[in-house]
Amino acid sequence: MADKKSVAIVGSGNISTDLLYKLLRSEWLEPRWMIGIDPESEGLARARKLGLETSHEGVDWLLAQSELPDMVFEATSAYVHKAAAPRYAEAGIRAIDLTPAAVGPGVIPPANLRAHLDAPNVNMVTCGGQATIPMVYAVSRVVEVPYAEIVASVSSASAGPGTRANIDEFTKTTSAGVQNIGGAQRGKAIIILNPAEPPMIMRDTIFCAIPEHADHAAITQSIKDVVAEVQTYVPGYRLLNEPQFDEPSVVNGGNHVVTVFVEVEGAGDYLPPYAGNLDIMTAAATKVGEEIAKESLAATAGGAQA
């Protein structure tokens, strides 16, 4: 369709397959290719049944085609995307990176969605980042946040080989995002793979140090406003209870602190609802891809009219 941007999904695992279902519903993006390296991949088989062109010969195959996609969504691993990113750029393909490679600027929709719509490569940070950085941002836009710490607890069953291979990059990339996008002066990220059966829904705890005389009501309202914004693309994102304000103590390092508890229930497109950590990643990536497509199509239409 002329009014949709063509898309290739690189990677054929859990995240890529869930992403495919979201992209198929998009009014702005048309998934046409799925690329993997395993010929027996369930993701490739599903994509074929849904009418996509598939290959297990990787990025080499995709870039050798006579028709190239307008946009690539990559959900492989950090080191794979680092190698492929310059090749996408050379071919003029916009890249949305769902690995922790962080080749391009990180994007968390409530915080900085519109800042990087013209970037050739954008990074979706991490699942923990997508769930928690909006809360740090909600606090830091009201008061100074000298330190923020996030703890993401996800079901072990939702963490495939790619997630496990990227654990070190996860903590580095998320910590950097807490600072650079969330607005904290210092940030720390911790991920817990919870082995409980039946699998637990994704839960996140966000600690933000705040000034002594901070306006608690303004912080609480800002948090609720950002939660509502995230819910426009992840309906299962919710506060578990009211933000909690604590006086300085030995436990919190002598800081005045606000603590936010959220949980993320997935939409159940391909992954089970407990895998909210993966669902928020694919939903946020779809949101960013759609905004890039809208901007690009609007610019094209404007140029044609001129």
From Swiss-Prot:
- Enzyme class, spelled out: oxidoreductase
Q: Tell me the Gene Ontology biological-process terms attached to this UniProt entry.
A: catabolic process
Keywords in alphabetical order: Aromatic hydrocarbons catabolism, NAD, Oxidoreductase
> Which residues does the annotation say bind NAD(+)?
12-15, 158-166, 277
Give the Enzyme Commission number.
1.2.1.10
Q: Which InterPro entries match?
A: Acetaldehyde_dehydrogenase, Acetylaldehyde_DH_C, NAD(P)-bd_dom_sf, Semialdehyde_DH_NAD-bd
Fetch the SUPFAM superfamilies from UniProt.
Glyceraldehyde-3-phosphate dehydrogenase-like, C-terminal domain, NAD(P)-binding Rossmann-fold domains
Catalysed reactions, semicolon-separated: acetaldehyde + NAD(+) + CoA = acetyl-CoA + NADH + H(+)
Q: Which residues form the signal peptide?
A: none
By sequence similarity, the record places it as follows:
Belongs to the acetaldehyde dehydrogenase family.
Xref: NCBIfam families? ac_ald_DH_ac, PRK08300.1
Q: What is the protein's given name?
A: Acetaldehyde dehydrogenase 3
This chain's source organism reads: Mycolicibacterium vanbaalenii (strain DSM 7251 / JCM 13017 / BCRC 16820 / KCTC 9966 / NRRL B-24157 / PYR-1) (Mycobacterium vanbaalenii)
